[in-house]
Design a protein with these regions (language model features):
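Domain-level signal for soluble alpha/beta catalytic cores
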Residues: 1-163
Length: 163
């Protein structure tokens, strides 16, 4: 519900961050149930902020929301080189890859990762997001999905597992 309110601009980043912190605390309690199988894991989502960008608030927010949606999240951190994303694709077969950026100067890193993904594993889903990212950019570089907010990312992930 919070994600929907954020995407509809009913609440803003401070409220979203407070909600994400509360979710993070609840995930600490729920994590053992995911591990022992009492709560079904929907899949693995690998996320990182691309090379040249040290910003992580958006990435962390998306990670918490997606984890709260029942996905296992592998966070590669910030300033992540293309080869680390590609290694993660091999290490986590079937995972969905999430690329985050806040700086326009790092969009070229996103494009490089998507291009390399096509050469190695064209079926692997790559999502992109961040302040400078648009649907036009997503289409231009051939990424599979763009969302301006975490709510859209979770909805997309839930759709692809139904296919």
């Amino acid at each position: 519900r919070v994600g929907k309110q954020f995407s509809e601009r009913i609440i803003f980043v401070p409220q979203m961050l407070m909600s994400a912190k509360a979710m993070g605390a609840s995930m600490t309690v729920l994590k053992p149930f995911f591990i022992n199988g009492a709560i079904k894991n929907k899949g693995t989502f690998v996320i990182g902020t691309v090379k040249g960008d040290l910003h992580d608030i958006g990435k962390n927010l998306v990670s918490m929301i997606i984890e709260g949606g029942g996905w296992s999240v592998v966070d590669l951190g910030v300033d992540v080189r293309a080869d680390r994303f590609l290694e993660a694709m091999e290490k986590y077969p079937g995972s969905v890859i999430g690329l985050s950026a806040l700086l326009t100067t790092t969009l070229a890193s996103m494009e490089k990762i998507v291009r390399e993904r096509k050469l190695r594993d064209s079926r692997r889903t790559v999502m992109i997001g961040g302040a400078p990212v648009t649907q036009d950019f997503c289409d231009k570089i051939g990424a599979d999905f763009y969302s301006p907010d975490p709510h859209g990312a979770v909805n997309y992930l839930d759709q692809i597992i139904k296919q």
